């Protein structure tokens, strides 16, 4: 077991804006987020469109994030609207500015548009007598100035504050929960299923279940050397986290050692394989352009075709000759997709990711490739990039993007895939 007395016991807050997108949309219309049934939908004109957010009252009807537009009952008291990303960003920034009245910028970490961490160890006592009183004050100011309700997790570290917020604060009467090291056996260990714990997905859960691990307590008591043998460094992290230990600090900003450039898309309807290939080509066009903009070439390709029901196909491949050309990437993806994908299946999700970059001027010439033709391809691709940059991404498009399967032109002008 671990000796918690050797660990630093800080006052870290994890703050989540309750039903953020739906709440902002309600407030913009002068509606009460807690009493209104409202759904934010990716595209209100498409019945298969995904629900991005729902108010608590709508969730009571069984409609939640990830549901589809056609699942919403036809009722006069239900509002269905498109997202407004600019408005969401403005409100998110306003809330962060409220938090920065109390702490220096280095003590705030923006985890997502509607969630952030604050380390108030050295500052809360200047404004309130206790951490709980400080949280009440902060929640009140955010509500009074933006109309947004917040839930707050208080913890000895970032992990415990996050879990306290997710597991307890969201369901408590005052929206605040505090988890300390001494609470680990009574609050953290009973959590199950394992996938409800931060950082554990269904695949990892299945592997742990085979070893008789069903609760976080089981995981905490399991010999970490076996976890390390099976999962590597991830196994060590899981064991530490299951015991409530997280050495990361808000001030220590995480640096990505092996960045990737990726793009994914949830399709508005079920696509046949040949149609999914069109969208995959559009996604590859986008990521290849972004790699060229950084003057890089990529060595590793990872792609996924997700079926409309469950499962799908994913594959990672490392190239001998790194590239930033769409045709090279598409050729590799289709080589494996044609072999691995079920041609009779219907598809709903697609993704492509490029990684393992080197500078494009460091790429070695290949004796097995026509370098003159490659140079022409690169010049053409960069010319199209410049046209897109100057006139917009719709200036030059492949013919397939104008087919019924194409989605490129329907997504022009969107932010994060949604309307501004």
Where are the language model's segments positioned?
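DNA-contacting surface of Y-family translesion DNA polymerases
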Residues: 5-7, 14, 206-347
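Short acidic, glycine/serine/threonine-rich loops at helix termini
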Residues: 24-27, 50-54, 160-168, 232, ...
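Acidic, metal-coordinating catalytic segment for phosphate/diphosphate chemistry
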Residues: 24, 321-420
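Long, highly charged, low-complexity intrinsically disordered interaction regions
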Residues: 130-193
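Residues that scaffold, gate, or flank divalent-cation-dependent active/transport sites
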Residues: 1-113, 117, 242
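Short beta-strand-to-loop capping motifs
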Residues: 118-122, 321
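Short Gly/Ser/Thr- and Asp/Glu-enriched loop/turn motifs at secondary-structure junctions
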Residues: 111-115, 155-158, 296-300, 345-349
């Amino acid at each position: 077991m671990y000796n918690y007395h050797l660990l630093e016991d800080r006052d870290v807050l994890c703050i989540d804006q309750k039903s953020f997108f739906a709440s902002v949309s309600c407030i913009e219309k002068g509606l009460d987020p807690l009493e209104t049934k409202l759904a934010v939908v990716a595209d209100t004109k498409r019945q298969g469109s995904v629900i991005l957010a729902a108010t608590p009252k709508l969730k009571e009807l069984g409609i939640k994030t990830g549901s589809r537009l056609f699942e919403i009952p036809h009722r006069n008291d239900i509002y269905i609207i498109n997202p407004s990303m600019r408005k969401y960003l403005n409100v998110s920034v306003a809330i962060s500015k409220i938090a920065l009245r109390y702490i220096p910028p280095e003590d705030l970490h923006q985890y997502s548009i509607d969630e952030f961490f604050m380390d108030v160890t050295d500052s809360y006592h200047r404004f309130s007598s206790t951490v709980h009183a400080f949280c009440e004050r902060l929640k009140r100011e955010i509500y009074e100035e933006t109309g947004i309700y917040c839930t707050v997790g208080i913890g000895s570290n970032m992990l415990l504050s996050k879990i306290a917020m997710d597991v307890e604060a969201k369901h408590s009467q005052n929206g605040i929960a505090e988890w300390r090291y001494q609470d680990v056996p009574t609050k953290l260990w009973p959590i199950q299923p394992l996938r409800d714990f931060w950082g554990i997905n269904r695949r990892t859960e299945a592997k742990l279940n085979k070893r008789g691990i069903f609760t976080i307590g089981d995981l905490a008591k399991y010999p970490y050397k076996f976890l390390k043998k099976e999962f590597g460094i991830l196994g060590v992290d899981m064991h530490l986290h299951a015991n409530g230990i997280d050495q990361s600090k808000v001030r220590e900003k995480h640096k990505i050692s092996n960045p990737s450039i990726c793009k994914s898309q949830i399709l508005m309807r079920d696509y046949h394989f040949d149609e999914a290939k069109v969208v995959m080509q559009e996604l590859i066009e986008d990521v290849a352009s972004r790699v060229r903009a950084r003057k890089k070439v990529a060595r590793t390709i990872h792609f996924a075709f997700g079926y409309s029901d469950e499962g799908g196909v994913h594959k990672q491949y490392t190239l001998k000759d790194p590239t930033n050309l769409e045709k090279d990437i598409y050729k590799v993806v289709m080589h494996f997709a044609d072999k691995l994908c079920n041609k009779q299946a219907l598809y709903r999700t697609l993704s492509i990711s490029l990684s393992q970059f080197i500078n494009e001027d460091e790429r070695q010439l290949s004796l097995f490739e026509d370098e003159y033709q490659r140079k022409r391809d690169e010049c053409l691709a960069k010319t199209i990039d410049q046209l897109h940059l100057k006139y917009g991404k719709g200036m030059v498009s492949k013919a397939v993007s104008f087919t019924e399967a194409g989605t490129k032109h329907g997504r022009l002008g969107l932010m994060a895939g949604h309307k501004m």
